[in-house]
């Protein structure tokens, strides 16, 4: 899996839920998850991939399977 693939899938999931980067940050704040604007920007731009706990948070908020975000699964499974 490349950072680009994660980024592409993250953007697809965000579009499907009509989420902007700020929506992810606000959801994180509500749940007590440390997620800054720069982190989300790096994930969306493909510069980095989140650690496991953040990956699972993103998947939960966007209602997708974490393996799909990581491109371990080719079919999207909205939960």
Q: What role is predicted for each listed range?
A:
Residues 15, 26, 30, 42, ...:
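Alpha-helical residues within the helix-turn-helix
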Residues 10, 24-25, 40-43, 69:
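Conserved hydrophobic/aromatic packing and binding residues within compact polymer-binding modules
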């Amino acid at each position: 899996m490349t950072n680009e693939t994660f980024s592409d899938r993250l953007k697809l999931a965000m579009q499907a839920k009509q989420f902007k980067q700020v929506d992810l940050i606000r959801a994180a704040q509500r749940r007590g998850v440390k997620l800054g604007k720069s982190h989300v920007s790096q994930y969306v731009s493909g510069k980095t991939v989140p650690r496991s706990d953040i990956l699972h948070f993103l998947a939960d908020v966007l209602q997708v399977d974490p393996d799909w975000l990581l491109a371990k699964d080719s079919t999207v499974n909205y939960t």
